């Protein structure tokens, strides 16, 4: 099942974008200052923005820059151990008996949103949470 999560993340990564992007020097400089240890990165461009795709410490990243090298959005894909403790505690209390399957964290200038997939023996539960632990069930699916 974890493979499904990774495949879904990879598919989303490549949707509606083009390859062979040449980021501006400002973008490359900003990226290298922030992510000094990253050696393998692929770039995509769309809508006058550049997207860096890479992995670091078992977390898959998508970081979007404007042409001036400013980060406009980041998306990270990871597992339960990387969720903030506060969010983990809220999940455990509200969704007792369910296990975190995967997390998509979306960060913009004004917001951090966690899209969390939970599972138990019979269902998949998609939960959305903000940084304050305000969460709700987006959808619930029965396993086949």
What are the language-model segments listed below?
Residues 85-134:
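Surface-exposed, polar helix/loop patches in the mature regions of secreted/periplasmic/lumenal proteins
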Residues 39-62, 106-126:
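Exposed beta-strand-loop-beta-strand "reactive/processing" segments of non-cytosolic proteins
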Residues 78-81, 142-144:
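A short acidic/small-residue loop/turn micro-motif
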Residues 1-23, 31:
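Bacterial Sec-dependent N-terminal signal peptides
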């Amino acid at each position: 099942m974890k493979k499904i999560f990774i495949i879904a993340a990879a598919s989303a990564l490549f949707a509606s974008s083009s390859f062979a992007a040449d980021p501006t020097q400002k973008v490359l400089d900003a990226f290298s200052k922030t992510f000094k240890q990253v050696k393998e990165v692929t770039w995509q461009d769309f809508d006058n923005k550049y997207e860096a795709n890479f992995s670091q410490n078992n977390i898959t990243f998508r970081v979007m820059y404007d042409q001036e090298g400013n980060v406009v959005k980041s998306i990270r894909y990871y597992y339960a151990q990387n969720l903030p403790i506060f969010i983990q505690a809220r999940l455990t209390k509200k969704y007792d008996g369910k296990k975190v399957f995967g997390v998509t964290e979306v960060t913009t200038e004004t917001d951090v949103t966690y899209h969390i997939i939970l599972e138990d023996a019979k269902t998949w539960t998609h939960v959305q949470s903000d940084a304050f632990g305000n969460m709700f069930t987006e959808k619930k699916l029965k396993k086949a």
